């Protein structure tokens, strides 16, 4: 798709992958084109592909590095248990609705767990006056909190639109909708 579907966020970074969904009159139906494009995009997220990792590194790599966390390790922990299914695709002229079922960890829930666990770790830590040691403790606690957060399944509908060239893309607002889903579900 042309517009990006932000599947996950790390701090201020939204993770995005783009796939062009090009429909042609003699090829597959609009429903098939949309289903294939959405499925390929979500499969790339599930696999933690290099484009996804690069997106995380670009958006939050320095913050993760400060905590002693590699972007690939972070995404591996976040995506553990990630799954999806593409349900009904309903096309109505130049617009379409795609029903998705997504199973993933909630970044909001993981952050909340981290705050409590890090506070407890600081209260129980002795002689942690070195800034690097504090960051290392925060990084370790963040990964543990993320790994302890259980994946949840949520259902949502996303809107797609066809342009004048016959190409399908996500409608305006889908990126924000998916970011909200991944951050707070």
Briefly describe each language-model feature range.
Residues 1-11:
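Bacterial N-terminal signal peptides that target proteins for export
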